[in-house]
Each structure stands twice: as C-alpha cells, then as structure tokens.
UniProtKB/Swiss-Prot annotation:
PANTHER family for this protein: UPF0337 PROTEIN YJBJ
One family name in Pfam for this protein: CsbD
Protein name, entry field: UPF0337 protein BCE_1081
Organism: Bacillus cereus (strain ATCC 10987 / NRS 248)
Biased composition regions of type Basic and acidic residues, renumbered to the chain: 12-28
InterPro entries: CsbD, UPF0337_stress_rsp, YjbJ_sf
Amino acid sequence: MSGGLKEQITGKVEKTKGQVKEGIGEVTEDRELKNEGKWEKTKGTIKEKVGKVKQKISDGLDNKE
C-alpha cells in the first residue's frame, strides 16, 4: 500500500472518529468533547488531502518511469 493511500485511509478514519465525538458532544452538551471532535475531524481532513496529493505525485512519478 502506498504512503498516500495509507494516509488517505488514516485521515478518513480520524475524520469519522472526530465526527462521532463531535456528535456525542453536541447531544450531551459536552463542549470539550465537541471541540475535540472538531479538531480530530479537521486533522483527518488534512491527512486525507495530503494523502491524495502524495498519491497523485506517486502516480505521476510512476508514469514517467
């Protein structure tokens, strides 16, 4: 598995965990948990996008060889 794909998957998992935490924080009115979920969701989104860029770069380099 390429680094880019692995990072995309890790990002999606982290983003999903963040969404769940944010939702639970919303329902339970736990601001700290809600904010923690938002932060995890943001980190996951960034990881996912970085993984996509890495994958495109890797694919581009593979095509040149």
